[in-house]
A protein has these predicted regions:
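The substrate-binding groove and active-site-proximal loops of carbohydrate-active enzymes
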Residues: 2-14, 28-35, 87-90, 157-171, ...
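Conserved alpha/beta catalytic core and glycan-binding cleft of carbohydrate-active enzymes
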Residues: 28, 40-193, 197-198, 206-210, ...
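Alpha-helical packing segments of well-folded alpha/beta enzyme cores
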Residues: 12, 16-23, 171-182, 186, ...
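Acidic/Ser/Thr/Pro-rich low-complexity tail/linker regions in eukaryotic proteins
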Residues: 215, 272-278
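Extended hydrophobic/aromatic segments used for targeting, binding, or gating
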Residues: 201-233, 237
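Structural scaffold positions in well-ordered secondary structure
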Residues: 23, 34-35, 55
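Substrate-binding/active-site clefts of carbohydrate-active enzymes
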Residues: 1-27, 40-44, 49
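Catalytic cores of secreted or luminal carbohydrate-active enzymes
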Residues: 223-265
Length: 279
């Protein structure tokens, strides 16, 4: 079980650590997702009571905290927002996104773990990211002013619910592309609950206040989307069966073990040349 806490910048680190100690000792919490003040990461990483507790932050300088050395137990994790940003750009075909895609596909720092995701509780669901280009948050009561305006989404030709076979087929293909990219990336993949079978919030990207069908997971959607649900299961099984997709070290893109080929390489139309410019 992971608990999410927000400690605003300026919160005394001693107080924040006391809060974490209470939840860890009293309720045996496995870890914490901590947002707000990322400077707490260094203090928490040195805390004896939290040495085996998973501590996930939005961002921090792991190289500085550990001085470039691999810790004996990697309990710090990065909620990899950069992954979501750049992989979504590549998924919808944005110009100049290929180089960033290849970087985030193989990124796995020595000092800490990275949690890769394409959707989480803050923003569009995965299905909505291929079905909506605009947020639809009027029901939240804030005149559609809440929620992010930069969602990096593409509706595949129609906004929201549609009966057009071509649009629906393209959305399914994009969902499969997204899951396959996630499952072939180094690091730890995170699938937001319901995304494994195409759950939708009808374009609401800030549904925390919707205690109704908008914010709930529609478990019946699994029966309506059996092809995609089966694909997700197969992609997870494929990842588990191939250790190269979740190695202990970040690929270097060179043949440093003298096997006759690099540990990872990228190719385009010409096998001998990797073109990193997509237009």
């Amino acid at each position: 079980c992971l608990m999410e806490f927000c400690f605003a910048p300026g919160t005394p680190s001693g107080f924040a650590l006391q809060v974490l100690h209470h939840w860890q000792l009293r309720y045996q919490i496995d870890g914490f997702h901590l947002v707000g003040d990322a400077s707490l990461a260094e203090e928490a990483s040195k805390d004896a009571l939290l040495r085996k507790t998973k501590l996930i932050f939005l961002g921090f300088d792991g190289a500085r905290i550990y001085q470039g050395k691999r810790p004996w137990f990697r309990n710090l994790g990065e909620h990899n927002q950069g992954y979501q940003y750049h992989i979504r750009r590549f998924l919808k075909g944005d110009e100049g996104s290929l180089s960033d895609f290849t970087y985030y596909l193989r990124r796995s720092p020595e000092t800490h773990g990275v949690i890769n995701y394409l959707a989480d509780h803050d923003g569009f669901t995965l299905y909505d990211s291929v079905s909506y280009e605009q947020k639809h948050n009027l029901d939240n009561g804030e005149d559609n002013m809440d929620g992010s305006n930069e969602n990096l989404t593409w509706n595949c030709g129609a906004e929201g619910v549609t009966r057009k076979p071509a649009v629906r087929a393209l959305r399914l293909r994009q969902l499969k592309n997204a899951v396959l990219m996630l499952m072939t990336s180094q690091g730890t993949p995170l699938i937001y609950g319901g995304d494994e079978f195409g759950n939708s919030q009808k374009g609401n990207n800030n549904a925390w206040c919707q205690d109704n069908k908008t914010g709930w997971i529609d478990w019946k959607a699994a029966a309506r989307n059996p092809e995609f649900a089966a694909f997700v299961k197969a992609a997870i099984a494929f990842r588990k069966a191939h250790p190269a997709l979740h190695g202990e070290r970040e690929p270097r893109l060179i043949d440093y073990k003298s096997y006759g080929c690099p540990d990872m390489s990228f190719h385009s139309q010409r096998a001998w040349f990797s073109q990193m410019e997509n237009t």
